[in-house]
Curated annotation (Swiss-Prot):
Name of encoding gene: betA
Organism: Citrobacter koseri (strain ATCC BAA-895 / CDC 4225-83 / SGSC4696)
Pfam family, any one: GMC_oxred_C
This enzyme's EC code(s): 1.1.99.1, 1.2.1.8
Any one Gene Ontology molecular-function term assigned to this protein's record: flavin adenine dinucleotide binding
UniProt-annotated catalytic positions: 473
PANTHER family, sorted: CHOLINE DEHYDROGENASE, MITOCHONDRIAL, GLUCOSE-METHANOL-CHOLINE GMC OXIDOREDUCTASE
Name of the protein this chain belongs to: Oxygen-dependent choline dehydrogenase
């Protein structure tokens, strides 16, 4: 089998590449996916409110676990990644958050990455998006990703939480992806007008899968990339439970889009990585690249949970006797409780003047429950998810064997610096100040978690060690750049070899301020033009907010 391009991983970036490359009818593409189809009849991946379900099994989730995390009481922590057409866009929380303009401007300060500035990238965010209230300078109107905005008649807790953030002295913003990210405001979501999850399988592959020049193979677990000398020439994979590899050859390039955990793992198994690690597993060295699998970053977050005095939370929706009606309303009308991810309000703030752009993110949820659907509080409640955005902690992903079915050793090294601890203490204390504002007076009951007895630095630190969880945003393990730990150049080409690119969240040099999915899709769009040899889209002329000397906050109301 010969193809022009072989794409490994039909996820948030891989599906973008498969769709854009096959727009050229004389270009043939093979798309390999280790998981299965995105079964449209399975409400678990299609109903936005069911977002906790795909995380609970292994049909759609790789369900990786970390090594014992040394600063987190040696807990083995969850590291869920999407498996199946759509990748992590099939199982994520559907928050459409792009990050801060300064994140990209920060990447672009590195020599060779100047074309990754915010204004260079904004046209690609717009190209990917169709926003339900129409396009403007920041948003698209005819892209493959459906974005839904919160409506005025949604849960009153969303409005109260935004007001409370403003009353606490922080800015208000009407669009967290627009002119100004900093502040509290409504949060967009990747949901279609019919109330379905807008994964990249739905948005991109649906328009491409009928093309004769695109071949999609599911249940195809990539073993390794084939090389002729230093030139990537093809891919070997295992289908289903088979132990006999299948292979295909690439006339032009192999495009690795397996994500921040699997992409470095595949490179290492293929002979590209740190020579000493590969030698330990008798893997023939193709190219010594010490940065492969290093620079691992993530967002850590925790929940502050409160009793709700008014019966307006989502608690009734968790009762089995209410669920048939909710399901029917969603299935037949695409409306109701089932049609939202319920992260419809949030915010970004600076916890101190030391930060030039926000370092803390909030998601608000009008129910008290764990992200994966466990430990629901048996009463009306609400919660704030809060966490730091650009932790200095760095981890790694290392293979444990040559077996593609064995998970790698993953260590995030969470909370390994003093900055991490200070940010989380500040975040908890600021959250309590926000919750104490007048806007929440009629709703706010007792603090369920961590509880008002948790006050000192030592008590807060112990709570974080015991209860903080991943926000499921791993990145950075094949970083872009030109220093000795960089893995790819500014076009995603792997240093030291030919005809091989990495295009996914692993190439982010530094994690962004917010959820990763929208930016991973943008990376796919931008790289697709580079691979096709097309002129980049014209740089945007939109203005954007830079805090400069603006104070972190105004005096709070209370």
């Amino acid at each position: 089998m010969h193809f022009d391009y072989i794409i490994i991983g039909a996820g948030s970036a891989g599906n973008v590449l498969a769709t854009r490359l096959t727009e050229d009818s004389d270009t043939t593409v093979l798309l390999l996916e280790a998981g299965g189809p995105d079964y449209r009849a399975d409400f678990r991946t299609q109903m936005p409110a069911a977002l906790a379900f795909p995380l609970q099994g292994k049909r759609y989730n790789w369900a990786y676990e970390t090594e014992p995390e040394p600063h987190m009481n040696y807990r083995r922590m969850e590291c869920g990644r999407g498996k199946g057409l759509g990748g992590s866009s099939l199982i994520n929380g559907m928050c459409y958050i792009r990050g801060n303009a300064m994140d990209l401007d920060n990447w672009a300060q590195e020599p060779g990455l100047e074309h990754w500035s915010y204004l260079n990238c904004l046209p690609y965010y717009r190209k990917a998006e169709t926003r339900d209230i129409g396009p403007n300078d920041y948003h698209g109107g005819d892209g493959p990703v459906s974005v839904a905005t919160p409506k005025h008649n949604n849960n009153p807790l969303f409005h109260a939480m935004i007001e409370a953030g403003v009353q606490a002295g922080y800015p208000r913003t009407d669009d967290l992806n627009g002119y100004q990210q900093e502040g509290f405001g409504p949060m967009d979501r990747t949901v279609t007008p019919q109330g379905r999850r807008a994964s990249t399988a739905r948005g991109y592959l649906d328009q491409a899968k009928g093309r004769p020049n695109l071949t999609i193979i599911t249940h195809a677990l990539t073993d390794h990339i084939l090389f002729e000398g230093k030139k990537a020439s093809g891919v070997e994979w295992l289908e289903g439970d088979s132990t006999i590899p299948t292979r295909a050859m690439a006339r032009k390039e192999v495009l690795l889009c397996a994500g921040a955990i699997a992409s470095p793992q595949i490179l290492q198994r293929s002979g590209v990585g740190d020579a000493s690690l590969l030698k330990a597993f008798d893997i023939p060295l193709v190219h010594h690249l010490p940065g492969v699998g290093e620079n691992l970053q993530d967002h850590l977050e925790m929940y502050l949970q409160y009793e709700c005095k008014e019966p307006v939370s989502l608690y009734p929706a968790l009762q089995w006797w209410n669920q048939p009606k909710i399901g029917a309303e969603w299935l037949f009308g695409g409306t109701g409780v089932g049609a939202s991810n319920h992260f419809e309000a949030g915010g970004f703030i600076r916890s101190s003047e030391a930060f030039s752009w926000p370092n803390i993110q909030y998601h608000f949820l009008p129910v008290a429950i764990n992200y994966n659907g466990s430990n629901a509080v048996k009463e009306h409640g609400f919660q704030c998810h809060v966490g730091s955005m650009r932790s200095p902690s760095r981890g790694h992903v290392h293979i444990k064997s040559r077996d593609p079915r064995e998970h790698p050793a993953i260590l995030f090294n969470y909370m390994s610096t003093g900055q991490d601890w200070q940010e989380f203490r500040d975040a908890i204390r600021i959250t309590r100040e926000i919750i104490n504002q007048p806007a929440l007076d009629k709703y706010r009951g007792r603090e369920i978690s961590p509880g008002i007895t948790c006050q000192t630095d030592e008590q807060l630190d112990a709570f974080v060690r015991d209860h903080a969880e991943t926000a499921f945003h791993p990145c950075g393990t094949c970083k872009m750049g030109y220093d000795e730990m960089a893995v790819v150049d500014g076009e995603g080409r792997v240093h030291g070899v030919e005809n091989l690119r990495v295009v996914d969240a692993s190439i982010m040099p530094q994690i962004i301020t917010g959820n990763l999915n929208a930016t991973t899709i943008m990376i796919g769009e931008k790289m697709a033009d580079a691979i096709r040899g097309r002129e980049p889209l014209a740089k945007s002329t939109a203005s954007y907010y830079v805090a400069g000397d603006a104070p972190v906050r105004q005096p709070p109301l209370r």
